[in-house]
Amino acid sequence: MNVMNQYISKSEQLQTLMNTLDKDNQNVLLSGVTTSFYAPLLQMIFENKKRPMIIMMQNLYHAQRLYDQLIDLMDMNSVRLFPMDEFITAEMLASSSELRIERMNTLASIIENQNKIVVTHVAGATRFLTPKEIFKQADIQLEVGGTYELDELKRKLVELGYQSVRAVEHMGEFSVRGGILDVFPMTEENPIRIEFFDDEIDTIRYFSTETQRSINKVEKAALVPTFELVYSDEQVERFEKNIKERLTKTAPLVEGETRDNLYARIYGDIEKIKNNQDLEVMHKYISLLYEKPDTLLSYFDDPLVIYIDYNRILENQEHMNEDALAWQEGAIENGKTVVVIT
């Protein structure tokens, strides 16, 4: 235990906090704590309570900073970051691939074991996600000696957002040459080469994209979705019905070329959804695919949620709502989106 942890462990305030959590099992609002104390304090709460924790920060900058501090104190498997771009144009158009990879790793980690600290912020906590049970069932589990139809695997990879390429170089890509499937999962540092003998997996091994040489063999591999957006044909039918209803409501609000562009855009997006294309951009339609999308909180059974500087969190949430409304109004006027039906 370092000096700071020793100091905190002896404080009466910490004991009062622990007792409160024992009695009420409630969420916590923390403020007025020296910034450098948050990480060791959260570490001690986690180790004492032994339950999943979601730490809510006001923005991405503060979430990243706290995460970096926690990583210095704890095992990396016990701490995760769930980051999200904070600009409305990023949400509606395309967001950082680095942040997306971080989110996918975090979701996969939660599915595997919930008992961890996840640091997020307003934009991350409010982002709609594929329902947890659907996301859990979406991954592909491969095992040496298992029988798999290669064409079916290729189809499934496309559904999960993987892109077919000639040679795998980046996360989210796959290629097929004869009876060899190369795929770069979102949760791994290196791609995987799967060699088939007829329909049976003969070997699974990690390899280097630079040298193409094998790194090590494994008996099993899991291929998780490349995007938070995972859906079936049933959801596609729901989406098409819902988006066309909204298009009917929106069309009278614009005219001429703007209306033509709106129809072209929406019908183009319908085809993209059907063909699993541009899934990061198509994420804006998740509420039309699912009746009740989940959020990060929904991926946990009984988390302790700790809000740090709650007033700033509320302020940031209000600003985000205002920005989203302004973007929606402008996008409708310019034929870039459809109205929300309430």
Which residues make up each language-model segment?
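ASCE RecA-like P-loop NTPase motor cores
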Residues: M1-T342
